[in-house]
């Protein structure tokens, strides 16, 4: 998601998205470890999305 889209969400929605993204990153790491992940750049995308969400949550505080 883009930062502009994330800024439109409430803090509760952002926290929900954060948990979802963290779970997705966890799953991607498992798939990478078992050599089932074809697109390894998706791990970086997930990390960047998590960072964006955390940054926007801090801005809203």
UniProtKB/Swiss-Prot annotation:
<dbReference type="GO" id="GO:0006412">
    <property type="term" value="P:translation"/>
</dbReference>
<dbReference type="GO" id="GO:0022625">
    <property type="term" value="C:cytosolic large ribosomal subunit"/>
</dbReference>
<dbReference type="InterPro" id="IPR001854">
    <property type="entry name" value="Ribosomal_uL29"/>
</dbReference>
<keyword id="KW-0689">Ribosomal protein</keyword>
<protein>
    <recommendedName>
        <fullName>Large ribosomal subunit protein uL29</fullName>
    </recommendedName>
</protein>
<dbReference type="InterPro" id="IPR036049">
    <property type="entry name" value="Ribosomal_uL29_sf"/>
</dbReference>
<dbReference type="Pfam" id="PF00831">
    <property type="entry name" value="Ribosomal_L29"/>
</dbReference>
<comment type="similarity">
    <text>Belongs to the universal ribosomal protein uL29 family.</text>
</comment>
<dbReference type="InterPro" id="IPR050063">
    <property type="entry name" value="Ribosomal_protein_uL29"/>
</dbReference>
<dbReference type="InterPro" id="IPR018254">
    <property type="entry name" value="Ribosomal_uL29_CS"/>
</dbReference>
<keyword id="KW-0687">Ribonucleoprotein</keyword>
<dbReference type="GO" id="GO:0003735">
    <property type="term" value="F:structural constituent of ribosome"/>
</dbReference>
């Amino acid at each position: 998601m883009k930062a502009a889209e994330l800024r439109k969400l409430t803090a509760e929605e952002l926290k929900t998205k954060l948990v979802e993204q963290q779970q997705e990153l966890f799953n991607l790491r498992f798939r990478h470890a078992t050599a089932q992940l074809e697109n390894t750049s998706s791990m970086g995308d997930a990390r960047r999305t998590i960072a964006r969400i955390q940054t926007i949550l801090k801005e809203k505080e």
